[in-house]
Every structure is written in C-alpha cells, then in structure tokens.
C-alpha cells in the first residue's frame, strides 16, 4: 500500500502520545521515523517502529531522559545517553561532533548507555549536508556468530561513512551481509536474497531470509573480514565511551539497550579549499562511473547516490508500506 509522509508521521505520533511520550518529544521522534521511511530505509523506519514501541513499553527506552556530558578532552567528548530515545540522541551527538569539528577541525563524541539509533546513515548524512565528513558506528547485542563459530557472540555493529560530495557519497553498512531488518524486508516481499546472506540449519550458505531470521546464523560481511571488523569496532566504542561491550549488553541486559556509539565529524574545508575539494571528488566519481559495465543495462553506482532518487520517488508517488506492518502500527 501507499501512504504519504503526513500519514506516516501522524500514525507514529498518535502511538507515541498514547505511550505517554511528551508532545514535543513525540513529534520529533515521529518526524525522524517518517523521514527514514520516506528515504526508502523501511527496515529501520516503519518496519522497526513496533519493536521500538515494545522496548518503550518494557522500560528499555526512557523517553524523558536526556544525554549528559561526562568528560571533555579537547576535540573528544564522552557522553552518557541515560537510555534516552536512540534516534533523537544520535542526532544531538552528531550535532555536537560537528560543533567540536568547527573548533578543532575534528570532533569525536563517544556515547554510552544508548539505545538503537534506527537508521545510522541519517547521522552521517547530517554531517555531509553541512560539508563535513561524517563517520559513526554502534555496537549491539550479539546477533552474529564470529567466523568459525555457531553461537552469536558478536554484533552487526553498523558503520557509516559519509562524504560531502555532490551528491553525497555514503556507505551505511552492518558487519553482516544483510541486517536483520533487510532480511525482514526481503521475506515480507517474498524475495530471495540477491547473494548468500547466512547459513541454513545444516551449515550451508543460503539466500533464504526467513531461514536466517529463525536460526540467527547471519553471514559476516566478507566472511572473516566482517567478523574481525565487528570485533574491533566494538572494542573502540567500548573503550572510548567507557560503556558496555557486545558481551556486556548480551549477558547483562534483558534486551538490546545500553549500547555504545561513536560519532566523528571532520571539517574538510580546514584542510582543502572548496574548488579543489569539488574537483578531486568529481574526478574520483567520474573515474569510477565511466568504467566499462559488466552489464550494459546496469549503471556503475556510487554508494548512497540512490537515496536522492528514492526520496524524490516517494515524495512524488507515495511511500510503500507493507500491509501487515501498517496493520501492526494501526493496532498499537
């Protein structure tokens, strides 16, 4: 089915107000969920909203909480999220990293006791729109087996890197081949994954999203490389924030809350003039996109460049929402 941005936001806002979230907070949170969905990231927008409300009802998310600064060390700050609403707090933390970068050329905010930030790409994009390089990542509950193991002991720990090119170039990727949210999107659409995304119950690689959702044997991105990167991202976020690691979140909490996150902004214009920056970025993009195509009908793409097109299409034609997901939200 198709809905408008206004219908989405109104539905989210109603549920949040019914959950006794303060009006101003509910409006800001509903706006972010609707913007994420409008951008085409359904897995961490409309599809994730019922799970968000479940955690709100369970007390994992404390809607009235506000993040508190703990430590300042020049361009680095350490904050405690106090288990506040994840997407609203993440936006504030990237804003703070940008402020630090304006003073120091680079800003780093390490956040502990945080909640799921929904679409991580929103915060990298936020920095790039203002002319900064944006880098951020989060750890998570253990939902992936390290390479060579069967048990989930590492997080998907998504990493975002956004570059202020025209259009913005951005990588937004979990350390698994697919996030669990994207497994759900493909399952709801009745689609196989385009490439292997995990293991079946017999330990064979599979493209069947429902199987991977059930057995939790998701495939690390790049096999052992994604497994290793997940581990070091967790270590850095834990140390810089003095927060919880994947092990602590998994073993000590009843659900995924109290995670650790990193937000970095770099002011490129302190290092290179605007004209030179634009020329260098354009040369990189042209060099890549003019490569001979493997399939003459499929263009060579740069990461993140499709988001502007998706946003325009959804604004023009309406936002596609799975019927069963919309029914869940209406029933909340």
Swiss-Prot record:
EC number of this enzyme: 1.1.1.130
UniProt-annotated binding residues for NAD(+): 168-174, 224-225, 304-306
Pfam families associated with the record: Ldh_2
Keywords: Cytoplasm, NAD, Oxidoreductase
Top-level taxon of the source organism: Bacteria
Subcellular location: Cytoplasm
Reaction(s) catalysed by this chain's protein: 3-dehydro-L-gulonate + NAD(+) = 2,3-dioxo-L-gulonate + NADH + H(+); 3-dehydro-L-gulonate + NADP(+) = 2,3-dioxo-L-gulonate + NADPH + H(+)
GO cellular component: cytoplasm
Complex and partners: Homodimer.
Function (record text): Catalyzes the reduction of 2,3-diketo-L-gulonate in the presence of NADH, to form 3-keto-L-gulonate.
Name of this protein: 2,3-diketo-L-gulonate reductase
Organism: Klebsiella oxytoca
Lineage: Bacteria, Pseudomonadati, Pseudomonadota, Gammaproteobacteria, Enterobacterales
